[in-house]
């Protein structure tokens, strides 16, 4: 592994913590985050990494860096970023090509975990493995009947498992679109995070935009980390 040495860190804060009610940087929250990570660490009989610098960035929004650079939206155009993770929903509106942030929204109780729980419950009823890993894999492969026949022990309940997952996905999509009704007038929508593909259909139905104006960012679960790494490399 990597030997203990001086390191600089890039970390993130949820949008509702990074920005204040006026969509300005919340310098107090950012300062606390930096100070917390720059505290000296002492290990008993061991060497520790020394944090020399901490850069704090907002979650979600940086995932759109590369795509907005390709599209080059005008200063009057707005882009809604919807970031759906396991337990949280973050969203923000970018003006132009990161000229400004006009709105942010966060809800720490909306996430893919509600679909995972539904899948695990259905798998349990089908006498099958119910770990989060298996449940998430079943969700991703819910339309692959051959795969489901291999992992669901009670084959007679395969359709019931699929129906429970579909119901949970529909419910999640409805909750996300309800949370974000105030942002229907944007010019485009980008979806990121592990739940992006699950809510894509619901977003397309709820936003009155041309199909090419709504996108799931490539490899959405890794998009934020990838774009932050690219940003730091160029910085």
Locate each region found by the language model:
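Nucleotide/phosphate-binding catalytic cleft detector across ATP-hydrolyzing
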Residues: 1-81, 98-112, 142-189, 193-235
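Glycine-rich phosphate-binding loop plus the immediately following alpha-helix
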Residues: 92-132
């Amino acid at each position: 592994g990597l030997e203990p040495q001086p390191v600089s860190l890039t970390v993130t804060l949820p949008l509702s913590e990074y920005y204040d009610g006026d969509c300005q940087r919340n310098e107090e929250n950012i300062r606390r985050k930096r100070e917390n990570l720059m505290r000296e660490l002492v290990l008993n009989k061991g060497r520790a990494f020394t944090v020399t610098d901490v850069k704090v960035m907002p979650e979600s929004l940086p995932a759109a860096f590369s795509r907005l650079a390709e599209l080059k939206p005008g200063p009057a155009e707005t882009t809604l970023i919807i970031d759906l993770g396991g337990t949280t929903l973050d969203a923000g509106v970018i003006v132009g090509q990161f000229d400004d942030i006009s709105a942010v929204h966060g809800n720490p109780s909306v996430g893919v975990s509600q679909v995972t729980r539904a899948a695990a419950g259905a798998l349990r009823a089908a006498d099958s493995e119910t770990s989060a890993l298996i449940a998430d894999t079943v969700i991703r492969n819910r339309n692959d009947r051959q795969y489901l026949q291999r992992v669901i022990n009670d084959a007679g309940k395969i359709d019931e498992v699929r129906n429970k997952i579909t119901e949970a996905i529909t419910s999640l999509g409805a909750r996300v679109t309800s949370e974000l009704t105030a942002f229907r007038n944007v010019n485009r929508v980008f979806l990121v995070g592990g739940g992006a593909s699950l809510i894509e259909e619901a977003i397309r139905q709820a936003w009155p935009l041309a199909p090419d104006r709504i996108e799931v960012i490539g490899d959405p679960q890794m998009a934020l980390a990838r774009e932050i790494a690219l940003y730091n490399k160029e910085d």
